[in-house]
Swiss-Prot record:
Substrates-to-products reaction catalysed: (2R)-2,3-dihydroxy-3-methylbutanoate = 3-methyl-2-oxobutanoate + H2O; (2R,3R)-2,3-dihydroxy-3-methylpentanoate = (S)-3-methyl-2-oxopentanoate + H2O
Binding site for [2Fe-2S] cluster: 59, 132, 204
Pfam families: ILV_EDD_C, ILVD_EDD_N
Modified residues (N6-carboxylysine): 134
Record organism: Verminephrobacter eiseniae (strain EF01-2)
Cofactor: [2Fe-2S] cluster; Mg(2+)
Active site: 482
GO BP terms, alphabetized: isoleucine biosynthetic process; L-valine biosynthetic process
This protein's UniProt keywords: 2Fe-2S, Amino-acid biosynthesis, Branched-chain amino acid biosynthesis, Iron, Iron-sulfur, Lyase, Magnesium, Metal-binding
EC numbers: 4.2.1.9
Name by which UniProt lists this protein: Dihydroxy-acid dehydratase
Length: 568
């Protein structure tokens, strides 16, 4: 008997047809003809390519070849590539200056650019190419807001530099500044380290923020397997960009969208991988924002829940030995994920951009890491039994604060507060030898509203490490830390000082306790005295009254909510 059922096939240009089909769209099509389109192109999908190429930073200066490869892949697969630009800020270059306050702002600008171009131009899909830290969360947030089929192409990691038999990376230079100030490193060696630390294109080489977020994107399933740990100069990175474009065309055909992929279970997978690889504290802030863009319930306490059951399996910088290129050679993120999956710590049923489940993607990955490498540990021989990114609470951070707690020789410190209302004066105090072992530095008015923009504190923390104080001095801030930071440091303190959080009421010499075991951040001052200080406190005047910084300060939510601008 004949099957009388009919199958409706959705056109692959289902969105762009709004501006390319019908007589009334003749003026619209004339604009395309001006760019070399022919009549047959209007039945093909219009595929955006958000190109983050920039000569501002080595993180992004190698992206054009990836964009070109993606364009080629789109066209070979039957699509029309439409390229538009997205900006970047170099965190490494802006670090320690007023420019660093624009870093987190750029996350929002990037997401706005992508949402605006994709939605305004009725694009059928988008491929995002990015490199530096905020390119990743900004890109994915824009993809999720627009919610058309999309894939992320990470620009790739940088190769290590070398000097006197030692491997170098960008954090080596920040720490060398502290060593030089402490008289432990000559001016000549400082200059040589400066020149040799970054030998070419790519993002900073350890499990810092860019590599953390790219690894997490692979774990989400929004990027291709193995792509997150490839080096930018290598041909496989370019080939991966082209392959990503072809996968995207299939996703457009199947109408597989980012919000189908970035679910609560997928975010749990990503956070488990962040914990297992020893990733950046910034991932906490960014995944709160990503979940918000995806419409997924996710709180700061969810990170602590995942942390407590996930071991650290990878020995990676900043606190470990190895770089992302070493992780790639050892089996990459798929090897880490397979170990977690077999241990029941991943959701194998999550869908990926290829249309496969994560379990299917990992099917042929070995059950145990290779014996000839030391980067990835077996699940029964972890580096640490629990994850490293802990959420600390107490009267200094009732909404939470973020700390890296693994590998600390002194997980508890109680000491006198050394209070600074800006980063530069704190850095100068370290370089001048005014900070002593046992002190607890308090850097405040550096949160989302107070900074504004929640700048990273790599210059002070790097100087502490270089001066030999990384294990003996505590540092807390309502700002952020670079992915390259390690030591007894606590960031993202919420509520922030500018919002009247307790951190605003700390006085020089007050006793503060950081207890990584009890997950406690406490001002050891009587509640009655804190209440008196609160009653006398007035919010400082806004540091910016015009432009993007003023808009960010006015609209930003608490760090405990991701410092997003649309939490209305």
């Amino acid at each position: 008997m004949a099957d009388n059922k009919t199958t409706t096939i959705e056109p692959i240009n289902r969105r762009s047809a709004n501006i390319t089909q019908g007589k009334s769209r003749a003026p619209n099509r004339s604009m395309y003809y001006a760019m070399g389109y022919v009549e047959g192109d209007f039945v093909k999908p219009m595929v955006g390519v958000a190109n983050g190429h920039s000569t501002i930073t080595p993180c992004n200066s190698g992206l054009q070849k990836l964009t070109d490869a993606a364009i080629e892949g789109i066209e070979e697969a039957g699509g029309n590539a439409q390229v538009f630009g997205t900006p970047t800020i170099s965190d490494g270059m802006a670090m320690g200056t007023e420019g660093m306050k624009y870093s987190l702002v750029s996350r929002e600008v990037i997401s706005d650019c992508i949402e605006t171009c994709v939605s305004g131009q009725w694009l059928d899909g988008v491929l995002v190419v990015g490199g530096c830290d905020k390119n990743m969360p900004g890109g994915l947030m824009g993809m999720l807001r627009a919610n058309v089929p999309a894939i992320y192409v990470y620009g790739g990691t940088i190769l290590p530099g070398h000097y006197q038999g030692r491997e170098l990376n960008i954090v080596s230079v920040f720490e060398a500044v502290g060593e030089n100030a402490a008289g432990k490193l000559s001016d000549h060696d400082l200059r040589e380290i400066e020149k040799r630390a970054i030998p070419g294109t790519g993002s900073c080489g350890g499990m810092y923020t860019a590599n953390t977020m790219s690894s997490a994107f692979e774990a989400l399933g929004i990027s291709l397997p193995y792509s997150s740990t490839m080096a930018n100069p290598h041909d496989e990175k370019t080939n991966s960009a082209k392959a990503s474009a072809k996968v995207l065309i299939e996703a457009i055909r199947n109408d597989l969208k980012p919000r189908d992929i970035v679910t609560r279970k997928a975010i749990e997978n990503a956070v488990a991988v962040i914990m297992a690889t020893g990733g950046s504290t910034n991932a906490v802030l960014h995944f709160l924002a990503i979940a918000h863009a995806a419409g997924v319930p996710w709180s700061i306490d969810d990170f602590e829940r995942v942390r407590q059951k996930t071991p650290v399996l990878c020995d990676l910088k900043p606190s470990g030995k190895y770089l992302a290129v070493d992780l790639h050679r050892a089996g990459g993120i798929p090897q880490v994920m397979k170990l977690l999956l077999n241990a029941g710590l991943l959701h194998g049923d999550c869908i990926t951009i290829e249309g496969k489940t994560m379990a299917q993607v990992l099917k042929d990955v070995p059950d145990r890491p290779r014996a000839d490498q030391n980067v990835i540990r077996p699940i029964d021989q972890p580096l640490y039994a629990q994850g490293h990114l802990a959420i600390l609470k107490g009267n200094l951070s009732p909404e939470g604060a973020v700390a890296k707690i693994t590998g600390l020789k002194n997980p508890v410190i109680t000491g006198p507060a050394r209070v600074f209302d800006d980063e530069q004066s704190a850095l100068q105090a370290i370089l001048d030898g005014k900070i002593q072992a046992g002190d607890v530095m308090v850097l405040r008015y550096l949160g989302p509203k107070g900074g504004p923009g929640m700048p990273e504190m790599l210059a002070p923390t790097g100087a502490l490490i270089g001066a030999g104080l990384g294990e003996s001095v505590g540092l807390i801030t309502d700002g952020r830390f670079s992915g390259g930071t390690w030591g007894m440091v606590v960031g993202h303190v919420a509520p922030e000082a500018a919002a009247g959080g307790t951190i605003a009421f700390v006085h020089e010499g007050d006793s503060i306790t950081i207890d990584a075991r009890q997950l406690l951040l406490q001002l050891n001052v009587a509640e009655a005295e804190i209440a008196r200080r609160r009653a006398r406190w007035t919010a400082p005047a806004a540091r910016y009254t015009r432009g993007v910084q003023a808009k960010f300060a006015f609209n930003a939510s608490s760090a405990s909510q991701g410092a997003v601008l649309d939490a209305y």
